Regions:
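Hydrophobic alpha-helical transmembrane segments of multi-pass integral membrane proteins
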Residues: 1-138
């Protein structure tokens, strides 16, 4: 597995675990103010990062693009900045607003980079796979 796919899948598990622990904590305390944070950690962190990672696993040539590395850092940093800002806002700290907005735009930028990486990967001819009939060798 290439390093980029691995980093995304590890980040997905970390974000998903944080989202689940937050959900469990909210259920135990009956304090659901951070429910939007729980949702974003699970959907943006766990699901989106897992999709990114599995895509880069399936298209290893796409993971070698410089834009793919930029995309990872935009996505990872954007998630942390956005979630920090969102948590602050939900706990009535207005100072979280610029962080939530900045993180949102970073996350959007990461998705647009991902689209660019995919377009570039789909435009490049893939190496032909030479499958031989059973019993024949090259």
């Amino acid at each position: 597995m290439n390093g980029l796919a691995q980093r995304y899948l590890i980040a997905a598990v970390l974000a998903g675990s944080c989202g689940m622990m937050l959900g469990i904590g909210m259920g135990i305390t009956h304090d659901f103010r951070l429910a939007p944070l729980h949702v974003h950690l699970n959907l943006l962190g766990w699901v989106t990062f897992a999709i990114y990672g599995l895509t880069f696993r399936a298209l290893p040539e796409a993971a070698t693009q410089g834009l793919a590395r930029v995309q990872f850092w935009l996505a990872a940093t954007g998630l942390v900045v956005f979630c920090g800002g969102l948590a602050a806002l939900r706990l009535d700290y207005a100072a979280g607003f610029p962080f939530a907005v900045t993180g949102s735009f970073m996350t959007l930028g990461a998705m647009l980079c991902f689209g660019g990486v995919l377009l570039r990967a789909f435009a490049e001819p893939r190496a032909a796979s030479h499958v031989l009939p059973a019993g024949r060798t090259a």
